[in-house]
Each structure stands twice: as structure tokens, then as C-alpha cells.
A protein has these predicted regions:
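Short, mixed-charge aromatic SLiMs
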Residues: 48-51, 147-158, 217-225
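Residues that form generic nucleotide/phosphate-binding pockets
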Residues: 16, 27, 47, 164, ...
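Cysteine-cluster motifs in flexible loop/terminal segments that predominantly coordinate metals
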Residues: 19, 180-226
Length: 230
């Protein structure tokens, strides 16, 4: 069991399972580079959270947006895009917003399409485990909504996925404690990463190291600040 100060972002699990180096660059070194794909993903999350009410009742479904999450067992905290509460005859929990019994059903919004790597499923399963710990009820299913297909992909939180999620959470804490960024390894999935140029810059006439790339990036940012002050 972890303490409050030891909790790490639930969203970091997706990065960790996709690539430990990407996770370390973001959460250890504080490096982030937007590209059209990440910007599209941010817009999708904003639409999921919406500007309307945080919760609304649609028939036998109560929709809650931007829901706070926490698990001391996994050592994670964060927010869920959407948690649907489905009305059930038995085995659910009571909510202040509506009468009856309800079961939580987390929904995470992602740009693109379903991936071969189960990084999105692990993140969603971690959200389910957080909800179980917070609400004291089993969460057996959820869904991933992909912007490219405009469809949901159902996810069952079976023993295998739960074990993968617990291992990923443990590894995330180990990685943060080690304070060491893993070495770069070129893989086909690197082309999908917004940090590709930071992680493994394309060699220029004199060769471009990560250090040189970051130095140039800082100089551009400082130049932008100077122009704003003028």
C-alpha cells in the first residue's frame, strides 16, 4: 500500500506499456513535444469532458465526466474521461444523484485506432481498479472510444489484464525510483511517438545528439519569451 505522496499518474501506465523510455522522458525529464496526433488526442479528451454538467442521467445510464481516481494499492491517481453508471437490479451501489443500484463502467477516449500493444487496456483497467477501491464494488467491464473509428471497443477486466496492470504499476514505481531513463531502441512504433525527434534525433551534417536538440529547443523557447517581453 502506498502513501498519498507516493501516488503516480494513472495516465503514465499507457506511456510505460507503450515504451518505458517514452514514459521516463515525460515523467522523469519533463519532456513533451506535441504533434498533430497528440493535439487531436487533446481535443478528443476536451470533447469527452465537455463544457456541460459533470453528470447527467440518460435513461438507465448516469454519465459522470472528469472523475477523480485513486488507488493506494497500485499507488496511482488521476482522472477518468467518463464513468458511466449502469442501473442494475442487484449487486450495485447507491448514488446521491439517482435512486436505485448502479455499477460503474469506465470509458477512456483515445485518438487513432485500437493498438496491438495493450497499453490503452492497461490504463483503463487501472481506472477500474481505482473505482473498485474507492466505491467498494466490482468493475468487470469498460470501453475504449477511438476517434478514428468513432466506435467503442469493449474491454473485459479479466485476471490476465489485471495481472498485467498490477505489474505495470509496480514497474512504473520502480522506474520513477531508479531515476534513470532507459536507452533508446529503434522500433517500428517509434514513428507513432511525438517524442521521436527528441528521443532519437535524425543525424544532421554534424550529427545531432539529444543534448544538442534540447539545447536548440531551449534557445527557441527563450527567444520566443524575449520577443513577447518586447
Amino acid at each position: 500500500v502506498y502513501a498519498e505522496d507516493d501516488l503516480l499518474p494513472v495516465s503514465a501506465l499507457q506511456h510505460l506499456v507503450f515504451c518505458e523510455r517514452q514514459c521516463a522522458l515525460i515523467y522523469l525529464e519533463g519532456i513533451w513535444e506535441d504533434n498533430p496526433l497528440t493535439i487531436e488526442g487533446s481535443h478528443l479528451h476536451e470533447r469527452a469532458h465537455g463544457s456541460g454538467p459533470r453528470s447527467e442521467l440518460r435513461g438507465d445510464t448516469l454519465i459522470a465526466r472528469d472523475v477523480a481516481l485513486r488507488s493506494f494499492r497500485l499507488g496511482l491517481s488521476g482522472r477518468a474521461d467518463v464513468v458511466e453508471f449502469h442501473r442494475v437490479a442487484e449487486g450495485g451501489i447507491r448514488l446521491a444523484e439517482a435512486d436505485g443500484l448502479w455499477l460503474p463502467f469506465p470509458v477512456e477516449y483515445k485518438r487513432g485506432r485500437p493498438k496491438k500493444i495493450r497499453c490503452d487496456e492497461v490504463q483503463l483497467c487501472a481506472q477500474a481498479i481505482c473505482l473498485e477501491e474507492m466505491l467498494g464494488v466490482g468493475v468487470m467491464r469498460g470501453a475504449l472510444f477511438y476517434g478514428a473509428t468513432k466506435k467503442r471497443t469493449g474491454v473485459v477486466f479479466d485476471e490476465g489484464l489485471r495481472a498485467d496492470t498490477e505489474r505495470a504499476a509496480k514497474r512504473l514505481h520502480e522506474l520513477m525510483a531508479e531515476q534513470r531513463t532507459p536507452a533508446a531502441v529503434r522500433e517500428p512504433k517509434c514513428r507513432q511517438c511525438s517524442l521521436e525527434e527528441v528521443c532519437m534525433p535524425a543525424p544532421g551534417p554534424r550529427g545531432r545528439s539529444v543534448r544538442r536538440y534540447l539545447h536548440a529547443s531551449m534557445e527557441r523557447n527563450l527567444a520566443g519569451l524575449d520577443s513577447e517581453e518586447e
